[in-house]
Amino acid sequence: MTFNDSKSMVYAGKVNYLKRGFLLYMCASCLLLVQFVIYLVNSNYWESLNFVGGFYYLIAALGQAFLFNLIPWVVLYLPFAWWRQMRKVGTMLFTCAIFLLNVLAYLNGIVFQLYKFHINGFVLDLAFGEGGNQVFVFNDTLVLHGVFIGLLILLFTLVVIFIAYRYARYVTSKQVKIGIYLFLFSCIAPQLTHAYAAAANVNSITEVSACLPQYYPLTANRLMLKLGVVKKEDLYVNNPDKGKGHGFVYPLHPL
């Protein structure tokens, strides 16, 4: 009887840890989603955004937030479900990952707002390479602003932890299934939508994709033609300038 009780307690502890992890993952993804939405609001596409483009971006941003949090969740959190004595370590590691991901997302948002591209190797070379202090000047005001934003992100991260611990016991298998379906839908549906939009020249969808970091939307013009979704003669009818690029136009006037 004692052995069975001990075994049931171990199982219950594992289930609670996984429930807490599910809430952590979902809330962390929502936190990152907010930053991705801010990318769009601060971009040049916001003024001309319509409902279709906005809804597409929201779902695509959610899928991207899910994917960004998936690796640290799987690597840093899930393995400790089978290591009872170290579960607090798993929670701490994933908490640090949430914080660092959001700090990086905030810095990336600044870069995207200023330069219209996301953090890449070129930007890192400028920042940390020779003469980087001449390219990026950090005065006292900027440092204080950075500290304030860091504390704000830390506060939101702690709120996520509080929600996970407070409401983990209310998580049901049905809610987990809904979360899985939402994950799959937000990762697959935007890709298929973009494949059609790229062939049908729906610019409200194709252009806003540039706001998402490390996002590589699907294009399948040949497949769309083969399936009869679009006609070959219609590929460039709606947008004769397709392929010339509209995110960056220089010079504004002929020289």
Model-derived features: positions:
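Transmembrane and membrane-interface helices of multi-pass
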Residues: 2-222
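Soluble catalytic regions of membrane-associated enzymes that act on cell-envelope
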Residues: 217-255
